[in-house]
Amino acid sequence: MDQQQNFQPLAESFYQVPTLELAKNLLGCILVKQTEEGTSSGVIVETEAYLGNTDRAAHGYGNRRTKRTEILYSKPGYAYVHLIHNHRLINVVSSMEGDPESVLIRAVEPFSGIDEMLMRRPVKKFQNLTSGPGKLTQAMGIYMEDYGHFMLAPPLFISEGKSPASVKTGSRIGIDNTGEAKDYPYRFWVDGNPFVSR
């Protein structure tokens, strides 16, 4: 159901926790994007943690520092938007300044602005609207221009939601060429939610 709500960004202190903790805490929170068409939001139902320097699956592995990854070295709470196979993905920078860690938002459950989401991403099956990291950015109007936005203010931020009743943990998806890192249990999802990517 499309719902109207006065969303307020989470405080900066919310992001100032270890990355694995943040990945779990984000479940149930509401991702919000304001555009000219209106405000779209979704309840975060799936995340993945990437632990920077020591995590072969992370863009900051080995302290790689490029123009693309520079924002990962900022303080927590910034948006790291990047392209993979022409799909935009949104991560929340985590840990502490100088430590290139982040949390990927893998899936959300549509909450408000659903008509606008369907205009951006027409789907036959509603469940496919935001059930993956590239799907949710397309549906919500999250673009490369959002890279480096500090998520404590509009147009892109995260708002308080409700803690899920049950959370599952498992290995991350789509990182088969990263050695033992592919088996790390750094993916978190809301048990039983139909918008989880798999």
Swiss-Prot record:
Protein's UniProt keywords contain DNA repair: yes
Domain of life assignment: Bacteria
Keywords: DNA damage, DNA repair, Hydrolase
Record EC number: 3.2.2.-
SUPFAM superfamilies: FMT C-terminal domain-like (SSF50486)
A biological process term (GO) from this entry: base-excision repair
GO molecular function: alkylbase DNA N-glycosylase activity; DNA binding
CDD domains tied to this protein: AAG
Family membership: Belongs to the DNA glycosylase MPG family.
Name of this protein: Putative 3-methyladenine DNA glycosylase
Source taxonomy: Bacteria, Bacillati, Bacillota, Bacilli, Bacillales
